[in-house]
């Protein structure tokens, strides 16, 4: 029975990827212009029938990434609202009500510019150890927090740049207890942190531009002993064995126009469809969308246009659905993996739909980075001069210089929140494909920000 067409095989591990000389099966760069797409094996068509459960509410200023704990049914959000890192936290949110239960008081660092937070950007949940891992991207460090107390329990902050455990510009992090490692993307390398010893091993993505010396994308995907890493500048997806930490396969991504960069951003897989899905930002709207590849061979199957800067994606294996954010339009695509087509588009705020995660009941949780009109009052605003934390609706920037080298004086800025979207769609089979169903969420009352927790 064919794995790609049988739902009886849902969740079954796919066989090992074939290895070529030197242990890497590579899809050549010329493949992007010359290869003929493999026809999709699934012709199932579905449409959205129930779109009532779509709610949007106020979130944090400066939202970056979102993570979800299935064990506690809590959502975790990392938010940093300003470049000077005077407004930053991680928040724990109830997945049912979307009420913000707690915001952490992050560690404060003093340097020659004054005081700043050890700011949070990337985030992931470790339900085995009851922790949350956070990337402090602009401080070149990674930290771990206790889920219950929200206190920092480990960090790489403060280690020297010459230390082999130093990670430059960490962006995304995922914890894998099967291999005993936490994987981190950053500049130059993908890093693996040993969960017991905290020692760091690094790998450059061979075949990426400049020998893999540029920034790696903000997203990673783990499955069955494989780490899938999209590399934006080279347009490739690297498949890394999590135990050996060696590249086993390289897939050259494709879009609608082979003369324009694809810029892959995120990746996921579907075992029952035997497919890899990759979101890509493209350039000026060209090559923005979802590309589909055969999971076993890496062969290109189809490109589906969506938005103007398709960014993050999340997969629901049980229903063969993929959810894709578009930073350009602020919409979220509901992509049907059985038919390989977009069947729904959920509105947010007109721009900057950013990160997405799937809840255990099949609901989808999305963050944007678009500021709402009204200013908000936060309990964790740091004074960069005194180091004092206050409840405020404004913050003061540090003086600096613009890109032309001109002096920019300090200024007072209003705090404005981003939004959180939650939705779930109902489905039914249909004989023919139809235009995507548009979904507009209703507003959910915001319950306010709680006092800060931990230190």
Task: List each language-model region with its residue ranges.
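Predominantly soluble domains enriched in secretory-pathway, periplasmic, or organellar proteins
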Residues: 4-7, 26-455
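Bacterial N-terminal signal peptides
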Residues: 14-24
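Bacterial N-terminal signal peptides that target proteins for export
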Residues: 2-15
């Amino acid at each position: 029975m064919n794995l790609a067409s049988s739902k009886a095989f849902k969740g079954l591990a796919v066989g090992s990827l074939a290895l070529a000389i030197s242990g890497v099966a590579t899809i050549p760069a010329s493949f992007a212009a010359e290869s003929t797409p493999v026809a999709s094996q699934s012709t199932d068509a579905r449409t959205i029938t129930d779109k009532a459960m779509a709610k949007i509410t106020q979130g944090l200023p400066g939202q970056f990434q979102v993570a979800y704990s299935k064990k506690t049914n809590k959502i975790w959000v990392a938010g940093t609202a300003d470049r000077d890192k005077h407004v930053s936290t991680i928040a724990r949110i109830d997945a049912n009500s979307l009420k913000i239960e707690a915001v952490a008081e992050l560690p404060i660092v003093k340097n020659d510019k004054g005081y700043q937070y050890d700011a949070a950007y990337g985030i992931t949940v470790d339900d085995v150890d009851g922790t949350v891992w956070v990337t402090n991207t602009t401080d070149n460090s990674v930290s771990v927090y206790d889920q219950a107390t929200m206190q920092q329990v480990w960090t790489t902050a403060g280690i020297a740049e010459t230390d082999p455990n130093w990670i430059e510009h960490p962006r995304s992090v995922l914890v894998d207890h099967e291999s005993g490692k936490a994987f981190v993307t950053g500049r130059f390398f993908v890093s693996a942190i040993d969960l017991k010893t905290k020692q760091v091993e690094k790998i450059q993505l061979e075949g990426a531009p400049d020998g893999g010396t540029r920034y790696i994308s903000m997203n990673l995907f783990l499955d069955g002993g494989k780490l899938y890493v999209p590399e934006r500048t080279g347009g490739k997806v690297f498949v890394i064995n999590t135990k050996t930490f060696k590249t086993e396969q390289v897939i050259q991504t494709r879009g609608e126009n082979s003369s324009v960069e694809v810029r892959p951003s995120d990746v996921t897989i579907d075992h029952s469809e035997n497919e890899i899905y990759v979101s890509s930002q493209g350039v000026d709207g060209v090559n923005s969308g979802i590309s589909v590849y055969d999971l076993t061979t890496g062969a290109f199957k189809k490109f589906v246009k969506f938005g103007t800067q398709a960014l993050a994606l999340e997969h629901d294996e049980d229903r063969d659905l993929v959810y894709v954010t578009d930073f350009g339009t602020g919409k979220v695509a509901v992509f049907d993996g059985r038919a390989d087509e977009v069947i729904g588009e959920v509105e947010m705020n007109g721009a900057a739909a950013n990160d997405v995660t799937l809840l255990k009941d099949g609901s989808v949780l999305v963050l944007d980075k678009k500021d709402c009109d009204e200013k908000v009052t936060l309990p964790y605003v740091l004074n960069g001069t005194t180091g004092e934390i206050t409840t405020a609706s404004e913050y003061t920037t540090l003086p600096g210089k613009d890109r032309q080298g001109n002096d920019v004086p300090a200024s007072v800025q209003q705090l404005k929140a981003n939004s959180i979207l939650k939705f779930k769609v109902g489905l039914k089979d249909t004989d023919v494909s139809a235009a995507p169903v548009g979904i507009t969420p209703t507003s959910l009352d915001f319950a306010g920000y709680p006092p800060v927790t931990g230190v």
